[in-house]
Amino acid sequence: MMTLPIVKGEYKKDYNLKHLTWFKVGGNAEIFFKPFDSEDLASFLRQNKQKLPITTFGAGSNIIIRDGGIEGVTIKLGQSFSNIDFIDDNHLVVGSSCLNYNLAKFCQANAISGFEFLVGIPGTIGGGAAMNAGAYGSEFKDIIVRIEAIDFAGNFLTFTNEEIGFKYRSNNLPKNLIILKAIFKVNKGDSENILLRMNEINATRSRTQPIKERTGGSTFANPEGGLKSWQLIDKAGLRGYRIGGASVSELHCNFMINNGDATAKDLEDLGNFVRQNVFEDSGVKLNWEIKRIGKYV
């Protein structure tokens, strides 16, 4: 029998995660936990003597939750982990559940440059740091000084930019880690110019990406050698290809869409079909950028 640690935060059993994801698919969390604060999270982790499986969940923007749901405890950091504050004139500390868009807007309002690209990346600061998210010529590695995190044993840890070991859409951090905060360097700029750049990015996204659809962002990371995943998918003749209720976007081939009745299986099957056909057509193995978690039905 599952015995849950005593916490200040909130537990929910058999919790429907579908409505929290951008794809609007997937099964339930066996246990859903929103900690009250970082000390509450640490207390939960230290009391987890049964070693219940732990899954972390962010904004649900770049993820497929499989139809069988998630075993164990799914942890989502709430509003208390979303603050943005100045440490000093040269550094910001940002909670990991803060949305990228909100940080971009804060920086524009405070004439801080270098964060404009975040307006075009759905998701949270924690998720972006974990995968070194990037767009429009910038990545998280360019702006992060260090992160503060907690491991699954409840130990608080700090990692500098160098220790994080940022790579293209990945890093060298331990797997059993929950990012709590990120510290960023501040470079002053002109508020009007920053806003212009953000508006340019938003206009480009609206023109080239299916942002009004049920999608999960870029499906595959771009392969090495300057190749673009969408070009390889298009070359393989897969623009608009459909499996069940899921399809490859007509507007941008590296996006999958839930047309309204897709299952998680439809989306994952479509992604795997695309990978197989691109490899047969071009000899290139595409790597998933979208995270797939949970059980198959």
Curated annotation (Swiss-Prot):
The EC number(s) this enzyme carries: 1.3.1.98
Domain of life according to the entry: Bacteria
UniProt pathway: Cell wall biogenesis; peptidoglycan biosynthesis
Keywords carried by this UniProt record: Cell cycle, Cell division, Cell shape, Cell wall biogenesis/degradation, Cytoplasm, FAD, Flavoprotein, NADP, Oxidoreductase, Peptidoglycan synthesis
Biological process annotations from GO: cell division; cell wall organization; peptidoglycan biosynthetic process; regulation of cell shape
GO molecular function, one term: UDP-N-acetylmuramate dehydrogenase activity
Active-site feature positions: 169, 218, 289
PROSITE patterns in alphabetical order: FAD_PCMH (PS51387)
Keyword Plastid: no
Catalytic activity: UDP-N-acetyl-alpha-D-muramate + NADP(+) = UDP-N-acetyl-3-O-(1-carboxyvinyl)-alpha-D-glucosamine + NADPH + H(+)
Lineage: Bacteria, Pseudomonadati, Pseudomonadota, Alphaproteobacteria, Rickettsiales
NCBIfam families per record: murB, PRK13905.1
Subcellular location: Cytoplasm
InterPro entries per record: FAD-bd_PCMH, FAD-bd_PCMH-like_sf, FAD-bd_PCMH_sub1, FAD-bd_PCMH_sub2, MurB, MurB_C, MurB_C_sf, Oxid_FAD_bind_N
Name this protein carries in UniProt: UDP-N-acetylenolpyruvoylglucosamine reductase
Domain FAD-binding PCMH-type: from-to ranges: 24-189
Predominant location: cytoplasm
Family: Belongs to the MurB family.
Any single GO CC term annotated in Swiss-Prot or TrEMBL for this entry: cytosol
Cofactor(s) named in the record: FAD
Role noted for this protein: Cell wall formation.
